Regions:
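Nucleotide donor/acceptor-binding cores
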Residues: 4, 29-31, 123-124
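Anionic group-transfer/hydrolysis microenvironments
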Residues: 7, 39, 129-130
């Protein structure tokens, strides 16, 4: 079994961002990295949305950014504005392409799909794979949304609506 200085288990958003940060900060110049990820190819499969509270290296992957938002509840909605913490959405397809293009230039980085055993004696191991059973006492935040296309402009794309829509 080949030894690696670093092993990242899980090549999704977290694992790839760690690999990318190591690469762009020149931490892999004389080190080897194995990324263990079962998927055969990276394709657009998600959209990640978040409040931008710190600068990040993925502004070129942002597909939309909002400074105006509305919080909707059963009792009504409240429109708010933020100048310093925009709400942003990143397209996973752009994200995967950017990171994999960068990582593919370093011959010390290898991707593996099927690994049955890992020798952990001489490696730093980073595991970004969530537990298969979630502890019910922990908070799990997950939003589900849909992208729709309409024939007429009926939405204000300058404001993000958070919460249940009022019909």
């Amino acid at each position: 079994m080949k030894e690696f200085d670093y092993v990242i288990i899980g090549g999704g958003c977290a694992g790839l961002s760690l690999a990318y940060e190591l690469e762009i900060n020149n931490k892999l110049e004389s080190k080897t990295l194995a990324i263990i990820e079962p998927r055969a190819e990276y394709k657009r499969d998600k959209t990640w949305s978040f409040w931008k509270v710190v600068d990040h290296n993925f502004d070129d992957c942002v597909i939309k950014s909002w400074n105006n938002f509305s919080i909707n509840t059963p009792s009504g909605s409240n429109e708010l504005k933020t100048e310093i913490f925009p709400y942003q959405s990143i397209d996973s397809g752009h994200y995967y392409k950017k990171i994999n293009t960068s990582l593919s230039k370093n011959k010390n980085i290898k991707f593996f799909k099927n690994i049955d055993e890992i020798d952990t004696n001489n490696s730093f191991i980073f595991n970004s794979v969530p537990e298969s059973t979630l502890d019910k006492s922990k908070i799990w935040q997950h939003f589900q949304g849909v992208e729709i296309e309409v024939e007429k402009d009926i939405f204000d794309d300058e404001i993000i609506k958070i919460g249940r829509a009022h019909v």
